[in-house]
């Protein structure tokens, strides 16, 4: 009977000795993000698309304790709404799907291979500073910082340069994670070259063509956010005047 349940639940989709398999990468990434202070409690999330499968970290599991058998698997493409129409082909018993799922799907529909959601304190702080200094409709921007080179200009446009100005849109938070989807998609449309969207008083969504690009872009952005907070303390402008 146990073998039948395992077969019906497609557990083979998350069983692999390959460390680069999404079901192994997601728990590893979540542990790293926990250790870096990007996610606490059970907040945040990570998802990877491989061919026509999407692997997603679950809701309610401590990030540093996550295992490969905790991972959900969806067919891709799949409807974002209603949740009951999503094509799950593997569901861990006694776990809930991530509330980030429709936001991850929005990134995958635009060609992403990996999407990361963190609750980085530096990301939250820059959203508050931008709101106070520039108003609720402003975006985060910074220029003339070397680490900007770690961010793409846009799909097929290469990487940003030292003299470029990086702009990241900011959307307002909502009471429920899934309700952010519309605002996230609107920001993606208004900023078609962006690979990230900040969520005020909440965190950030970052995506990339693959796992390495999403992770390194997330690292570069977090560095820039921390630097921006420290620059603000010293009265230094984020965008250098020409």
From Swiss-Prot:
<keyword id="KW-0963">Cytoplasm</keyword>
<dbReference type="GO" id="GO:0008270">
    <property type="term" value="F:zinc ion binding"/>
</dbReference>
<keyword id="KW-0486">Methionine biosynthesis</keyword>
<comment type="function">
    <text>Catalyzes the dehydration of methylthioribulose-1-phosphate (MTRu-1-P) into 2,3-diketo-5-methylthiopentyl-1-phosphate (DK-MTP-1-P).</text>
</comment>
<dbReference type="GO" id="GO:0005737">
    <property type="term" value="C:cytoplasm"/>
</dbReference>
<dbReference type="Pfam" id="PF00596">
    <property type="entry name" value="Aldolase_II"/>
</dbReference>
<feature type="binding site">
    <location>
        <position position="119"/>
    </location>
    <ligand>
        <name>Zn(2+)</name>
    </ligand>
</feature>
<feature type="binding site">
    <location>
        <position position="117"/>
    </location>
    <ligand>
        <name>Zn(2+)</name>
    </ligand>
</feature>
<feature type="active site" description="Proton donor/acceptor">
    <location>
        <position position="146"/>
    </location>
</feature>
<protein>
    <recommendedName>
        <fullName>Methylthioribulose-1-phosphate dehydratase</fullName>
        <ecNumber>4.2.1.109</ecNumber>
    </recommendedName>
</protein>
<comment type="similarity">
    <text>Belongs to the aldolase class II family. MtnB subfamily.</text>
</comment>
<keyword id="KW-0479">Metal-binding</keyword>
<feature type="binding site">
    <location>
        <position position="202"/>
    </location>
    <ligand>
        <name>Zn(2+)</name>
    </ligand>
</feature>
<feature type="compositionally biased region" description="Basic and acidic residues">
    <location>
        <begin position="1"/>
        <end position="11"/>
    </location>
</feature>
<dbReference type="GO" id="GO:0046570">
    <property type="term" value="F:methylthioribulose 1-phosphate dehydratase activity"/>
</dbReference>
<keyword id="KW-0028">Amino-acid biosynthesis</keyword>
<keyword id="KW-0456">Lyase</keyword>
<dbReference type="InterPro" id="IPR001303">
    <property type="entry name" value="Aldolase_II/adducin_N"/>
</dbReference>
<dbReference type="GO" id="GO:0019509">
    <property type="term" value="P:L-methionine salvage from methylthioadenosine"/>
</dbReference>
<dbReference type="InterPro" id="IPR027514">
    <property type="entry name" value="Salvage_MtnB_euk"/>
</dbReference>
<feature type="binding site">
    <location>
        <position position="100"/>
    </location>
    <ligand>
        <name>substrate</name>
    </ligand>
</feature>
<dbReference type="InterPro" id="IPR036409">
    <property type="entry name" value="Aldolase_II/adducin_N_sf"/>
</dbReference>
<comment type="pathway">
    <text>Amino-acid biosynthesis; L-methionine biosynthesis via salvage pathway; L-methionine from S-methyl-5-thio-alpha-D-ribose 1-phosphate: step 2/6.</text>
</comment>
<keyword id="KW-0862">Zinc</keyword>
<feature type="region of interest" description="Disordered">
    <location>
        <begin position="1"/>
        <end position="20"/>
    </location>
</feature>
<dbReference type="InterPro" id="IPR017714">
    <property type="entry name" value="MethylthioRu-1-P_deHdtase_MtnB"/>
</dbReference>
């Amino acid at each position: 009977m146990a073998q039948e349940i395992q077969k019906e639940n497609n557990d083979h989709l998350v069983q692999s000795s390959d460390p680069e398999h999404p079901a192994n990468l997601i728990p590893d990434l979540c542990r790293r993000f926990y250790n870096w202070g990007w996610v606490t409690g059970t907040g945040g999330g990570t998802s990877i698309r491989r061919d026509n499968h999407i692997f997603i970290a679950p809701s309610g599991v401590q990030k540093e304790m996550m295992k490969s058998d905790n991972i959900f698997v969806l067919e891709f493409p799949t409807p974002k709404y209603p949740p009951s129409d999503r094509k799950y082909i593997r569901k861990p018993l006694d776990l809930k799907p991530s509330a980030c799922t429709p936001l991850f799907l929005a990134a995958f529909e635009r060609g992403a291979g990996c999407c990361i959601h963190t609750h980085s304190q530096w990301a939250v702080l820059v959203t508050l500073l931008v709101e106070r200094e520039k108003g609720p409709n402003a975006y985060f921007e910074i220029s003339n910082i070397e680490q900007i080179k770690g961010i793409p200009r846009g799909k097929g446009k290469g990487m940003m340069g030292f003299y470029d100005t990086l702009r990241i849109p900011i959307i307002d938070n909502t009471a429920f994670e899934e309700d952010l989807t519309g605002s996230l998609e609107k920001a993606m449309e208004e900023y078609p070259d962006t690979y990230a969207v900040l969520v005020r008083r909440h965190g950030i969504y970052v995506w990339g063509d693959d796992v390495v690009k999403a992770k390194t872009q997330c690292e570069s952005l977090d560095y820039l956010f921390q630097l921006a907070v420290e620059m603000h303390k010293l009265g230094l402008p984020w965008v250098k005047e020409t």
